From Swiss-Prot:
7e possesses the tighter binding as compared to that of the proteins 7a and 7b, which may be due to the three supplementary lysines in the C-terminal region. Hyperthermostable. SUPFAM superfamilies: Chromo domain-like. Keywords: Cytoplasm, DNA-binding, Methylation. It comes from Sulfolobus acidocaldarius (strain ATCC 33909 / DSM 639 / JCM 8929 / NBRC 15157 / NCIMB 11770). Can constrain negative DNA supercoils. May be involved in maintaining the integrity of the genome at high temperature. Monomer. This is DNA-binding protein 7e. Highly stable from pH 0 to pH 12.
Amino acid sequence: MAKVRFKYKGEEKEVDTSKIKKVWRVGKMVSFTYDDNGKTGRGAVSEKDAPKELMDMLARAEKKK
């Protein structure tokens, strides 16, 4: 699986796409929640910086609506 690199509250983070639970679009950003060792973490990345796997997850989520 691919890793998503993003900044959250000024801190550089990286999360594996297999840990991502929910994905949605906010303007030109892709927001997501992920499993952070039992807690729910949040992150966002621009569409142009998002890996293909994350964009595929977003397309599946939007298709369900």
